[in-house]
Amino acid sequence: MIRSIIALMLSFALVPFAFASDRLTVKHHEIDIRVAIPLVADFCGRSVVLGPSIQGVVSLDFDDVPCSQAFDLLLESNHLLSSMVGDVLVITAMDQVLNSERKADDLRTFRRDLFNANDIERRVINIVHASASEVVSLFKESFMSLDAPGMSMTVDERTNSVFAALPSSFFPALESVIQAIDVPVRQVAIEANVVEASVDWSKRLGLNWGGALSLGNWSAVTAGDLSVAAGSSIGFGFLSNTLSLDGLFTAMENEGNGRVVSRPTLLTLDRQSASVLRGTELPYQQSAGDGATSVAFKHAALSLEVKPVISPDNSIVIEVLVSRDSPNFSNAIDGVPPIDTNRLVTTIRVPHGQTVVLGGVYSTINQQGSSRVSGISRIPGIGRLFKKKEHVTEQYELLIFLTPRILGLEVEPEKQSLVFDESFFLGDLF
């Protein structure tokens, strides 16, 4: 065999003129076809890949034959087919191609025999909770690889119904898919208490971000420090009991240590966002050209956006976005105040019924006032001794309490070991 290959290669080497004229002259008896094809292809300037089923021997006897004709005759006489893939010829045995086509015909016949048109059943199925389009898409991907004449699934978006024309044997699978995904989406109610409290009051409560949390006998541990801009120091923690939040806020307001800004309850579906916005638009004048002016507005608001995801253990993962934009009149330019922005974006896991508290967004309020003793303060000369002007600068912290609850869940909120003692808390601090 090796001698035959060497002899064939030498026969090609002895016809250098063939490269210029693109004609082939070669004569050889019984050489392995897997050797002959690449040699002829190389002489003709072609790249080939041989299929694994190609085998046998071939005799070559070409006398000044065009190269392309010689190559085609070599393939045809040995029942081989070629197909171009890019710049490469893929050579395949004709029997292999015929077998593949025969298998495809057999599969088509099998489908026709399996799903005769008379076996097609037609039904209208109403989808209650899920999207009919999603049901059809999922079923087609999973179960309808055996397509057949007469089979179809269409959707009526108006009634959220599926019109199915399928073999009877397919409907149990379709019903199982519908039963699995056509379920009501659970709802989550998130009670939010947005509080603006003095920093002194927060310190009296023992609120310390970035470590342990304690409000009297309230107790929690923060989930970790957050990376925020310098000067923000935003943090969060969990409270073990929420039964006396109302009393806590009432005492705060009665002592003048803060106020409840907003108390919204956001109701949303699992994996759906909900938001609340409270703010104002600040008017200012701007040039409109040709010396004219127009009134424009800057938006300053407190916004809260949440997206709950219910976990299998009935805890709730919440994506939280808190944003507070407030005007900074002390740095106003031509009467137009810049907008100071504080923003917190985080994801936290909260057990059903427990409270997470977010804080660390600060603002400063400057207050000026005066007091005097009636009558005496009006006496010239000595009256000024009975007057007093006051300038108070106080820093406030924005605290946001979030309590998520899964609607319809009968499980009691998880309790921690330390329980809030209202009498001790109010007696010591207020």
From Swiss-Prot:
Q: InterPro entries given for it?
A: GspD/PilQ (IPR001775), NolW-like (IPR005644), NolW-like_sf (IPR038591), T2SS/T3SS_dom (IPR004846), Type_IV_pilus_biogenesis (IPR051808)
Q: Where is the signal peptide?
A: 1-20
Q: How does it sit in the membrane?
A: Single-pass type I membrane protein
Q: Which domain of life is it from?
A: Viruses
> What UniProt keywords are attached to this protein's entry?
Host membrane, Membrane, Signal, Transmembrane, Transmembrane helix
Q: Give the subcellular location.
A: Host membrane
Q: What is its main location?
A: host cell
For this record, an example GO cellular component is: host cell membrane
Gene Ontology BP annotations: protein secretion
Q: Which residues cross the membrane?
A: 226-245
Q: What does this protein do?
A: May play a role in phage assembly.
Protein's name according to its UniProt entry: Putative assembly protein ORF430
Q: Which organism is it from?
A: Pseudomonas phage Pf3
